Regions:
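Oxidoreductase cofactor-interface core, primarily capturing Rossmann-like NAD(P)-dependent enzymes
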Residues: 1-17, 29-35, 40, 44, ...
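Redox-cofactor binding/interface segments in oxidoreductases and associated redox assembly factors
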Residues: 21-27, 51
Length: 101
């Protein structure tokens, strides 16, 4: 177990050093951190980044959580880090949603 300070790029980079593949499972409430993780992954020479974009197709979306996920795809392209997106269908959006009871 490695403790990471997501507000500190060096902390994220240190945690990712020597890692070949990052599979992000960040919830919708924390998607803003995913860009920082991707940037640190690029600096740490991670070979493949899988963003937390499981569910329906989000490419080109501009609104809400789908817009945020689309923005991450743009950031990954700009960083030049290899990435893979697994579209599993819209049902996954409901299964993995954060619910407050």
């Amino acid at each position: 177990m490695i403790q990471v300070d997501y507000s500190n790029n060096e902390s994220i980079k240190a945690a990712l050093t020597g890692v070949h593949v990052v599979i992000s499972t960040i919830s919708g409430a924390a998607l803003d951190v995913q860009g920082k993780i991707a940037a640190a992954a690029k600096e740490a020479d991670v070979k493949l980044f899988v963003p937390s974009d499981f569910g329906g197709i989000t490419e080109g979306e501009t609104e809400g959580i789908f817009g945020e996920k689309s923005n991450i795809q743009g950031q990954l392209k700009a960083l030049g880090i290899p990435y893979a997106i697994f579209y599993t269908g819209p049902f996954a959006d409901y299964i993995f949603a954060s619910y407050v009871f």
